[in-house]
Amino acid sequence: MARYRCCRSQSRSRCRRRRRRCYRRRRRCCRRRRRRVCCRRYTRYRRR
């Protein structure tokens, strides 16, 4: 659960700039349970 702590309660624009931490582990900001979190890999949730 602590792994998904990249873009949790951030805005879509802030999530894009705050996903630098996830970028290091090849992770992307995704939407999970109606909230933004760091995904393990580029999932199919490629929604803008």
Swiss-Prot record:
Alphabetized GO MF terms: DNA binding
GO cellular component, as recorded: nucleosome; nucleus
Name listed for the protein in its UniProt record: Sperm protamine P1
Predominant place of localization: nucleus
Protein's job: Protamines substitute for histones in the chromatin of sperm during the haploid phase of spermatogenesis. They compact sperm DNA into a highly condensed, stable and inactive complex.
GO BP terms: chromosome condensation; sperm DNA condensation
InterPro entries: Protamine_P1
Family per record: Belongs to the protamine P1 family.
Keywords, in A-Z order: Chromosome, Developmental protein, Differentiation, DNA condensation, DNA-binding, Nucleosome core, Nucleus, Spermatogenesis
A Pfam family per the record: Protamine_P1
Organism this protein belongs to: Corynorhinus townsendii
Locations listed in the record: Nucleus; Chromosome
Keyword Manganese part of the UniProt annotation: no
Source species, domain of life: Eukaryota
Free-text tissue specificity from the UniProt record: Testis.
